[in-house]
Curated annotation (Swiss-Prot):
Transmembrane segments: none
Lipid bilayer topology: Peripheral membrane protein
Free-text function comment from the UniProt entry: Interacts with the SecY protein in vivo. May bind preferentially to an uncomplexed state of SecY, thus functioning either as a chelating agent for excess SecY in the cell or as a regulatory factor that negatively controls the translocase function.
Underlying gene: syd
Name of this chain's protein: Protein Syd
UniProt keyword Phosphoprotein present: no
Alphabetical list of InterPro entries matching this protein: Syd (IPR009948), Syd_sf (IPR038228)
Length: 181
């Protein structure tokens, strides 16, 4: 596992949970994840769940993605999706507002791998170099991804060659993220 990425992700998650605690006096709250089972849930309201990150349980890799395309996925991406279970976290990187994606449970981890495979299928069909998403943005056509060739974190417009490098590594990107509440 890419330890620098794992450490940077845990550090950002601590910053996010700490900022939430400071602002709201509780663990993060999510309406979107209400009713979806997870080891992260610590309590529920009528229509939301309070959550805290939990250690990832299971095989710590995204080998299903590698097998589907006979490729080697950047080690940072393995670490990103298998360090912890947590809720998605809104954040800001420089001027870019985003939602950092996380796996909520083992079932969600399987779904994320299926979505990554679908993303790669589309890229292959359009003859684009492979990227693997890690965050969404308000504009549904823009995502934050890892370039699987270079390991750089990029902002890309889906279905196009339009890509902007944001950071040289995922660990660097995560270190510079700020929680957005």
């Amino acid at each position: 596992m890419d330890e620098l990425t794992a450490q940077a992700l845990k550090a950002f998650t601590r910053r996010y949970c700490g900022a939430w605690q400071e602002k709201h006096g509780s663990w993060p709250l999510s309406e979107e994840l209400y009713g979806v089972p997870s080891p992260c849930i610590i309590s529920s309201t009528r229509d939301a769940v309070y959550w805290q990150p939990q250690p990832f349980e299971g095989e710590e890799n995204v080998n299903a993605v590698e097998r589907a395309f006979d490729i080697v996925v950047q080690p940072a991406l393995h670490a990103f999706y298998t360090t912890q279970f947590a809720g998605d976290m809104p954040a800001q990187f420089a001027d870019e507002k985003l939602t950092l994606l996380q796996t909520w449970s083992q079932d969600d981890f399987r779904r994320v791998q299926e979505n990554l495979i679908g993303h790669l299928v589309t890229q292959k069909r359009l003859r684009l170099s492979p990227t693997l998403f890690i965050a969404t943005q308000e504009n549904e056509l823009e995502v934050i991804s890892i370039c699987n060739l270079s390991g750089e974190v990029i902002k890309e417009t889906l279905g196009t060659r339009h890509r902007i490098v944001l950071a040289a590594t995922l660990a660097e990107f995560l270190t510079q993220l700020n929680p957005l509440l």
